[in-house]
Regions:
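Short glycine/threonine-rich turn/loop motifs
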Residues: 14-144, 217-336, 341-344, 386-394
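Bacterial N-terminal signal peptides
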Residues: 1-5
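C-terminal capping alpha-helices of c-type cytochrome domains
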Residues: 163-182, 186-188, 192-212, 321-394
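Glycine/proline-centered hinge or cleavage motifs at structural transition points of membrane proteins
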Residues: 121, 128-172
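N-terminal Sec signal peptide cleavage junction
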Residues: 10-12
Length: 394
């Protein structure tokens, strides 16, 4: 059972457990995870505080038990054929659940695109996942890397084992026998994990990874819920100027050159979620990661642009599906003067005003103001919070 409560401007999803009093074995859980997992007092994933001004939510109701099981799955290298790669290998907590490598290393080679950050994956208007939106939901996405030959190896093709081989391996492990019985309320310990269970639990854990304790959020909480682009009382003058540059649309001349207004970033990455507009087309980055001369036009999904940098001010890994942007200055440079490759007939029209590639004419002062604003979107807890950390680390 579940219900929603609204308290002091925040909303929380409250879950009740219909099986209170049931007793579950945790001998293997204690042996493997020590004090990192306590089934008698699981971490709070379901009832986290969500600011009342956050509206976009593509998620399902999160269950603490299933998210706990999802945390184990996320960090377990047993999900790869050689036992060396976990989901967390490419989505590292210290880097905002991103990867500092341009291409992540899998069991049989490198990934075909840069690994996306997973922060606030739930809080987006776009429900599809992957850069090219090939997964209809986050849950559908979670087992595709497992079944990729290069990434985790359970493809079932050309001699690879398949997902059923993985399930047999996991169901033979005593800690999964205990965790799955507990998560699915089957005290007889006869619960076996299915692919749907993996998707549900991994999805619950990833959906729980949220970041709403940034400087931006501290100021945003002081305004009315619909004041997404208003100056924030805790911001410096440069940060507020950067916010306005981000939010305000540019005014172009008849050749696509900006003569007034802002930079228009909020047209595709709307505050306060800073997610991607579901109707966005590509942003001009259309090269393939392995061969920049080969066009890869369909990459229209983006993670939230919250936590682009970590609390130390360092970029949380390279940006774009090619991983070719390695600084915020380079990011601004790309949008400052859009280059439309021959054959790119799917570029977002917001980047080609009047049919001309945009020229934003960003000044050095505007560049620094814009970067100052982007740095206010960095949270704190996600980088160190134990409930999102590696439970195998004793």
């Amino acid at each position: 059972m579940s219900f929603i409560v609204l308290v002091n401007g925040y909303r929380c999803a409250k879950n009740t457990d219909d099986t209170l009093g049931a007793v579950f074995s945790d001998t293997a859980i204690k042996r493997i995870f020590g004090n990192n997992i306590n089934i008698n007092s699981p971490e709070n994933y379901a009832n986290q505080t969500i600011p009342a001004y956050i509206n976009a939510d593509n998620g399902r109701v999160i269950d603490d038990k299933k998210a706990t099981l999802g945390r184990v799955l996320f960090y377990d290298k047993a999900l790869s054929t050689n036992g060396n790669i976990a989901c967390a290998s490419c989505h590292q907590q210290e880097f905002g659940f991103s990867d500092t490598a341009v291409q992540s290393k899998g069991v049989n080679g490198l990934t075909g695109r840069h690994s996306m950050r997973l922060i606030n994956a739930r809080f987006a208007r776009e429900a599809k996942f992957f850069w090219n939106e090939r997964a209809a939901t986050l849950e559908a996405q979670t087992t595709q890397p497992i079944q990729d030959h290069a990434e985790m190896g359970y493809s079932g093709l050309d001699g690879d084992p398949d997902i059923n081989d993985l399930l047999a391996k996991l169901n033979a492990l005593d800690y999964y026998q205990e965790l799955s019985a507990w998560a699915y309320n089957q005290s007889d310990s006869k619960k076996t994990l299915s692919e749907n269970n993996l998707q549900e639990c991994l999805g619950a854990f990833i959906r729980s990874i949220q970041s709403f304790d940034s400087k931006y959020d501290e100021g945003r909480r002081q305004l009315a819920n619909n004041q997404n682009n208003a100056p924030l009382p805790n911001f410096s003058s440069d940060e507020n100027a950067g916010l306005q540059l981000f939010s305000a649309p540019p005014i172009f001349d008849n050749l696509g050159s900006r003569i007034a207004g802002g930079l228009g970033c909020g047209g595709c990455h709307r505050a306060p979620e800073f997610d991607i507009d579901p109707n966005t087309r590509n942003n001009g980055f259309v090269g393939s990661i392995d061969n920049p001369t080969v066009l890869d036009l369909g990459n229209t999904r983006s993670p939230s642009i919250r936590d682009l940098v970590n609390p130390r001010g360092h970029l949380n890994g390279p940006l774009m599906h090619t991983g070719s942007i390695t600084s915020l200055e380079t990011l601004i440079g790309h949008y400052n003067r859009i280059l439309v490759r021959p054959g790119n007939n799917q570029i977002d029209p917001r980047l080609t005003p009047g049919g001309f590639p945009q020229q934003l004419n960003v000044t050095p002062t505007e560049r620094q103001q814009f970067i100052s604003f982007l740095e206010t979107l960095t949270g704190k807890a996600i980088y160190t919070e134990a409930k999102w950390s590696n439970p195998f680390a004793l």
